[in-house]
Amino acid sequence: MNQDQALKAVVEPATMETDRFGHPLDPIVRYARGSILKSSDEEIVRMLRARQIVGERVRKSGKDSVYDLSGMNRGSGITVQDVPHLTSHVPFFAHFEGKTEPLALKHMGADPARHAALILNRVSAANFIALTTLLKLGARVFAFAPTGGQTHPSAVRPISMVSADFREFHSYTELAKAWEAQGAPRLLLITPISASKRHLPFAEFKQALALPRSHETLVYVDDAHMASRIAFFDEPPTYQVGDIDLAVCSADKHVAGPRAGVLVGRTDLVTAIGSRAYELGLEAQAGQYVGVGNALRNFDPGAVKHAGELAKRLIQVLAEKYGPKRAYLGGPGVSIAGDDVLEMALERGGARGKPGLVAVEAAGLVAMQMLEQDGILTIGAVAMPGSAPAVRLMMYPDGPRLGIEPIVASLERSIDRLSRLVHDVPAARAQLLGG
């Protein structure tokens, strides 16, 4: 048994789950692997190819020729004024050391008297180091994720690595029933907004935090999309929701900062986790640390709200075109699940039988087509391995600049293209991976 098989064995259900078309679901990422995107290796090739397409387009036609509908910024976040103090670690220590953590506490609504912050190089790094520090063999983890969404693979993987017992719930009723029957777990892991942009009802979020705990129970919130919760759903920052021990948010998801994880929690927990993070080199480096500070200081919910208003108009158009059960409002954007996109392509092309593609490949093909032909950059093109298999059209940051009509037209052309590729695996492979 190799390492990947060993990790999957820990979370493998007794009965193998399948997608709508009968393909078995990978128990870590919770979507089907196909003949093209067979593993993380191929997903990385697709991601790097998309980056190359963006680069070539910008070099040829300028950066405004790409319309960023990813919901992310991922720039450096540093200013011209910052640069002279980043020439070595000496001026960095004098001007920036210790300045970002207080901003992180404020951003997440934490209490400086009880909480501390740690700036890490990714949310995935935060999930990895926090969960492998807090959990051990056999520890029970109850995960609470939105209906239609899942706990992120970056959290499932470390839970599997330590051989903890992972169970996922999608309603408060299910969670409370298991809690009463089995007792409080070691860890309650809550995902308020999933990678597929499904949203956990706020009332259920609060109810979960109110469940009775043992002296060993910890609550960890993967609040990567906290900015959307605040700006679009009008919910409070993480630590204003209820009693939480540890939480992470992103510095780049609907925040104008670099890709980084902002980990905030009880001081004793952050101290222990921080020691291991420094051992493994997961801490944010100088420029990233400064960029995170600037992004948190300058976070503008208004820009996200504005994008959200455009998303509300877009969902009306797409729900009418594709059906209200297929297109759904995912915060300040619109999403369509990969299985639905694949089904739409089959219907449009009149194809019969089991498709030659799986959901993650179908969603990826739509994303790559929109990027190559129209310069529209979505998460599905540049996402890391494990990202949800869905077409996600986030209106931040460039939705207002592009407008609804070009977005709808590009999506239509891309689904048409997909309808011609559902049984043409070689052509689909060429578009996803190149060569």
Residue ranges and their predicted role:
Residues 29, 37-129, 153-157:
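Conserved N-terminal alpha-helix of the aminotransferase class I/II PLP-enzyme fold
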Residues 305, 433-435:
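Short, low-order "capping/linker" segments at domain edges
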Residues 90, 262-265, 349-351:
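Short, surface-exposed, charged loop/turn segments at secondary-structure junctions
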Residues 309, 313-329, 339-341:
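C-terminal structural cap/anchor segments
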Residues 2-13, 17-19, 24, 99, ...:
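Conserved PLP-enzyme active-site core in the AAT-like
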Residues 2-42, 327-429:
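Conserved C-terminal alpha-helix-loop-beta "cap" of PLP-dependent enzymes
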